Amino acid sequence: MTDLPDPLPVAAGIVSFHPDAALLLDLVATLSRDVGRIYLFNNAPLEPALEAVLADYPALVAITADSNLGVGVGLNFIALAASRDGFERLALFDQDSRPWPGMLPRLGLAFDRLEALRRAPAALAPRLVAPRGRVAGASKPPRYRPRRGCPPDGALTPVDFLPTSGTLFNLRTLRETGMFRADFFIDAIDLEWCFRAWARGQSCWLASDVPMEHTVGTGTIPLGFGLTMPNQRPFRMGTYLRNTLYGFRLAHVPLGWKLKQLLYLPLQCFGFARHHRFRAAAVGPMLRGLRDGLAGRLGVPPDGPPS
């Protein structure tokens, strides 16, 4: 087996909100071996004991917001800080991501290859898989949509969009494409950015031979027709619906995707409401999300989690 080279000038960023201490510490410990700096943006204060342990990592820079500003603000703050500090690439993670040692250098080699082939890569992601030992159906890994008319290169596949977690970004391209939409707060931020990158002549890639364990939601909801969806908290379902509907007015979001969502969203709404027994606490955020998406009202959701 060939030895991996020293890491390229790469930083890592994590956006957290009341994280599981053990998972976050494992993530920081793994990343500290492969990157020059770790930026941790906290949307809520950390427990003092966790802060004390994190202080032992000299490469970690922690920033805590006064209130929950959302994932988009955290991602942008991290990207700007890494750019200011001279890093060329940035890998972004959720607080419960589970990369393995050496994963980022391996993605870096693949990124180098795509750049050498002049494929204009903006982002490259590992393939997210359910954590080992999880009961079947406890988490739904994302489905990746291969980009039509764009040939793969071995295990590297061009895809329409990527989840943020584990994804390696070219910071120059990120700045040129534009930062993440902070007004989305959470949900569909990565999807909108990837569609924007494609519209500007850049590309997004999946390294299908590089798995990374990651949990999406708190179980799955059957929708019929062989379809399932992740079970999320009601406010998350509301922001997902809001941001998806708002995306219909964006020219860089493909028409085919919009038409597919027109068919899929009603199925998701009914399946989510039925799963939660049509309780007002579940249906209310969905209705507000639909209303706000149609009206173009974005920002911090009124029923979002407090700090």
Give, region by region, the residue ranges found by the protein language model.
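Short, well-formed alpha-helical segments that are part of the catalytic scaffolds
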Residues: 14-33
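Short beta-strand-to-loop acidic/aromatic patch adjacent to the donor-nucleotide binding site
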Residues: 87-98
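Non-catalytic, C-terminal membrane-associated alpha-helical segments of glycosyltransferases
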Residues: 249-307
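Conserved donor NDP-sugar-binding/catalytic core segment of glycosyltransferases
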Residues: 101-137
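Glycine-rich, basic loop-to-helix element that forms the pyrophosphate-binding segment
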Residues: 65-82
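Short, flexible, basic/aromatic active-site loop/helix in glycosyltransferases
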Residues: 140-160
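A conserved acidic beta->alpha catalytic loop
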Residues: 42-50, 67, 97-98
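A short, conserved alpha-helix in the catalytic core of glycosyltransferases
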Residues: 167, 173-178, 183-210
